[in-house]
């Protein structure tokens, strides 16, 4: 059996509109928009990256146009992302005023975590591990 080499994993977050989610990643966390695909007057797809992590956004309308089979299976569920950071305090300061869905906590597996709901409705847990 051949060995499969997985190179990376990038989440695709489906939203009604991409634009409200962009400041969360760009202005607050420093990611850059590296790819964008317009869909009429708005964005239909966007890829954000800082060289280490990537997050893709696609509108539900664009998904329906792109792949009816995938769209038929989309139920509107929201994703949960887990992102490791070097400084949880700096992260919390950068996201001051954003909706916290999991208050800062210490875990049994050695991390300090805090969870947010980004403007598209998806959940993002940020974690700093003790080194």
Show where each model-derived region lies.
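Conserved active-site tyrosine of GNAT-family acetyltransferases
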Residues: 21-26, 95, 118-121
């Amino acid at each position: 059996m051949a060995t499969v080499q997985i190179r990376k994993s990038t989440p695709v977050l489906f939203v009604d509109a991409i634009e409200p989610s962009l400041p969360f990643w760009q202005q607050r966390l420093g990611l850059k928009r590296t790819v964008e695909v317009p869909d009429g007057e708005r964005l239909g797809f966007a890829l954000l990256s800082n060289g280490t992590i990537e997050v893709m956004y696609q509108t539900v309308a664009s998904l329906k146009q792109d792949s009816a089979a995938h769209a038929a299976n989309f139920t509107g569920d929201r994703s949960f992302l887990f992102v490791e950071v070097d400084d949880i305090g700096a992260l919390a300061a950068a996201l001051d005023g954003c909706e916290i869905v999991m208050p800062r906590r210490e875990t049994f597996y050695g991390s300090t975590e805090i969870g947010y709901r980004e403007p598209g409705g998806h959940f993002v847990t940020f974690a700093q591990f003790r080194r």
